[in-house]
A protein has these predicted regions:
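Short FAD-binding loop at a beta-strand-to-alpha-helix junction that anchors the flavin cofactor
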Residues: 3, 7, 11, 71-88
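A conserved short coil-to-beta-strand element within the FAD-binding core of flavoproteins
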Residues: 3-4, 8-28
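Generic recognition of stable, solvent-exposed alpha-helical segments in well-folded globular domains
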Residues: 12, 20, 33, 37, ...
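Core beta-strand elements of the Rossmann-like FAD/NAD(P) dinucleotide-binding domain
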Residues: 26-37, 41
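Detector for glycine-centered tight turns/loop "hinges" at secondary-structure junctions
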Residues: 30, 58-59, 154
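Flavin (primarily FAD) binding-site architecture
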Residues: 40-57, 79
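Adenosine ribonucleotide-centric catalytic and binding domains
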Residues: 54-68
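C-terminal, flexible cofactor-proximal segment of oxidoreductases
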Residues: 67-68, 79-191
Length: 191
């Protein structure tokens, strides 16, 4: 595969298929790809937390009403963390940053005898723009993989237009944010 790609006789195209033609595929961009053989694939569908029904105190949790905090947890949801990957950078870089932050957070909770941490919107945050998670990642113009297009309603996460609710895809920015103080005006600790 890579030998053929380097030779210049093959290329990679990101587009959507408009229809199958006598000679191959007509793409929505208007380009036609010649093909002797077309292999179809169903792809996969993203699921948030494996479609687990999350509850807080017996009440169902509507994740579409939460905002992502520092790219790792959610507003008004206690003690729930996840690693949201970068789109163009190694997942392990993000895992390393989040792991270090969580170790600091758990050590802080142990030292302060707190059992729960939960980011809460500040009064000024209620006026911020609510940006769907995948729009926050890809913006409006980048071509997206099909599984991202299909994920819209399955991944109801939102980010905001300001720190710490703004979603980043930048390792250096995440490193700076996650190296900051554990206690801030957003994270609430309770016993």
């Amino acid at each position: 595969f890579f030998k053929v790609l380097r030779s210049g006789t093959a290329s990679i195209v990101t587009d959507k298929i408009d229809r199958i033609t006598d000679h191959g595929l007509l793409l929505e961009s208007g380009d036609e790809l010649s093909a002797d053989l077309i292999v179809t694939a169903t792809g996969f569908n993203l699921q948030l937390f494996g479609e687990i029904d999350l509850c807080i105190d017996g009440r169902p949790l509507d994740m579409s009403r939460t905002f992502i905090y520092k790219n790792l947890c959610f507003s008004d949801v206690p003690n729930l963390f996840c690693v949201l990957p970068y789109d163009k950078t190694s997942y392990t870089l993000k895992i390393d940053l989040v792991s270090k932050y969580l170790c600091r957070l758990f050590n802080h909770m142990s030292k302060t005898a707190t059992r729960q941490c939960m980011p809460c919107l500040r009064e000024s945050d209620y006026e911020m723009e609510s940006i769907p998670y995948f729009k926050g990642i890809f913006g409006g113009s980048d071509p997206k993989p099909g599984y991202i297009d299909r994920a819209g309603d399955n991944i109801p996460l939102r980010c905001g237009d300001r720190h710490p609710w703004r979603f980043t895809m930048n390792y250096d920015e995440d490193k700076r944010i996650l190296a900051g103080p554990i206690e801030d005006e957003v994270m609430r600790f309770t016993t």
